[in-house]
């Protein structure tokens, strides 16, 4: 998993509430267990019409937001089924941070496990960032995980909270496998000791 330290990029505004995981990545794209390639179908039913043509008015189809790395979203983002493909699709598209007033619990947890930083802010703070994001190509926002601050286009800063353990994992690029590998010496020592104590096992 890639480390998350400081992210500076275009913020795309998506003020819709209750964006569920089926909207993020529709069910017909869940057949794969690969994490790559899902970005092409991120928000598929909002990005494309029935003939597969881009819908020009959708935010991520607009030239200013095609390379967005930050998503400023509405309340209860990521609700619905618990598909891990949802954060996979966001990450594959290039989104490393989602900012909203609230997230569905499972989606929120899955983001951290896949290298995405979900940030919960007050409504007025999200509204301010949403206004900033409306600037298009000028909507450059910086997220500093170490200092837990967001810096807007005008230089104003907003502080955010994040669990200390999850922060540690993101800063060091540690997913569940990485965390286990950190304990490899202790695991090997335990196995060696257990083999001596119970050689019949």
UniProtKB/Swiss-Prot annotation:
What is the catalytic activity of this protein?
Answer: (2R,3S)-3-isopropylmalate = (2S)-2-isopropylmalate
Q: Gene Ontology terms, cellular component aspect?
A: 3-isopropylmalate dehydratase complex
Q: What does the subunit section of this Swiss-Prot or TrEMBL entry state?
A: Heterodimer of LeuC and LeuD.
Say what the protein does: Catalyzes the isomerization between 2-isopropylmalate and 3-isopropylmalate, via the formation of 2-isopropylmaleate.
Show the InterPro entries listed in the entry.
3-IsopropMal_deHydase_ssu, Aconitase/3IPM_dehydase_swvl, AconitaseA/IPMdHydase_ssu_swvl, IPMI_Swivel, LeuD
**GO biological process terms, semicolon-separated:** L-leucine biosynthetic process
Which species expresses this protein natively? Jannaschia sp. (strain CCS1)
According to its UniProt record, which protein family does this protein belong to? Belongs to the LeuD family. LeuD type 1 subfamily.
Entry's EC annotation = 4.2.1.33
Going by the UniProt record, its keywords in alphabetical order are:
Amino-acid biosynthesis, Branched-chain amino acid biosynthesis, Leucine biosynthesis, Lyase
The terms under GO molecular function for this entry are:
3-isopropylmalate dehydratase activity
Gene that encodes the chain: leuD
Going by the entry's taxonomy, the superkingdom of the source organism is recorded as Bacteria
Enzyme class, first EC level, given as a word: lyase
* Pfam families the UniProt entry points to: Aconitase_C (PF00694)
Q: Pathway of this protein? A: Amino-acid biosynthesis; L-leucine biosynthesis; L-leucine from 3-methyl-2-oxobutanoate: step 2/4
Protein name in the entry: 3-isopropylmalate dehydratase small subunit
